[in-house]
From Swiss-Prot:
This is UPF0210 protein Ppro_0613. Homodimer. InterPro entries: UPF0210. Belongs to the UPF0210 family.
Amino acid sequence: MFIHPEEILETLKMVNNEHLDIRTVTMGISLRGCCHPDMATFNSNVYDRILRCAEKLVRTTEEIQSLYGMPIINRRISVTPIAIVAESCQADDYCSVAETLDRAARETGIDFIGGFSALVQKGMTPGDLKLIESIPRALAITEKVCSSVNLASTKAGINMDAVALMGRIIRETARLTADRGAIGCAKLVVFANAPEDNPFMAGAFHGVGEPDCVINVGVSGPGVVNAAVRGLQGSPTLGDIAECIKKTAFKITRMGEMVGREVARRLDAQFGVLDLSLAPTPAVGDSVAAILEAMGLESCGTHGTTAALALLNDAVKKGGSMASSNVGGLSGAFIPVSEDEGMIRAVKRGSLSLDKLEAMTCVCSVGLDMVAVPGDTPAATLSAIIADEMAIGMINKKTTAVRIIPAPGTVVGDVVEFGGLLGSAPVMAVHNFSAETFIGRGGRIPAPIQALTN
């Protein structure tokens, strides 16, 4: 294949000036063969299995990074939802499993490990309930473990009992990690229609339909797209902007696929998916909000933001799907408040509210992500925010999620500092009117008519 010198220079510019990188190489590992009634034996099986599969993951990605000159920011692992594989154990909680995952993550040198998870969209088994009730302490005593719970799906409806429970779990997680800015909540996400091959944290888990061991890759390129849109000459129409984004997404995706396939080949693992998601960072310019403003919005969150985000999300998918036959995961545009310099600025200047973020989640990749709210926000209000987001996902047959941080002691206008890629989050206002009676009714919101597809 002939590569033009201009293409090489263009790629170097993307990496050096526009923050292009591989955000994550995530190894998915099946733990189904680790089940055992004795918890100590189970934990030993899990630890040995992870080390056997992932012992060369970090070294291999570093070699690939040196070979291609392409930064790989995170190396991660996802495992089979622990609520499924640990249910065979005779134990009151699963905190020891979280400690085992954390120990394996430290030993392999990876950044995060996901899969302390439960899938409860239609109901909870005893194992699901044990895992969910273990989440606050598990996230408080570990450093690298991430947790997720799927509460709803288009086919099953919304498990409102689990939604109500998760409001309390999030509050307790914030309390137990209050001395660290409620960091536990940044490692906990709830889903509707959770994908089984997502490489991004905190929602990554290795689905039961996945291979024994698989490599999934997530690419990051908001800075590249932002530079491309701002570099358009004259007065481009929105159609011109969409075409520009599509072509840029194509280039980004090809690079990610090349890296992912080579990592999988060297590790003798199956190549899974390439997640097209535009994942921002706190760096100036590496921002989804900045792309929306480059289209002509004065500030992200003003009227027109949802339309601009829909254009961006669709163009990224079209360009990426032309570049790879293995597109999966979440694949769209992330709008995490704390991780996006432009979003942070928009919240501080008053153009972006929680309600507008909810509207934006109807057309983008995931949902309400890394949103800080006052520390005294009631559990029922957190559950109601989750229920709204689950409804959007259920009705629209898409993945939606909530990662919300009720940081203890904070009020609207405060800033919660997380550091690193997690950035900092301005505390946003929630409605003062109660939804406690609604949430307290429990039960299940039935699946919509859209579920009847056969």
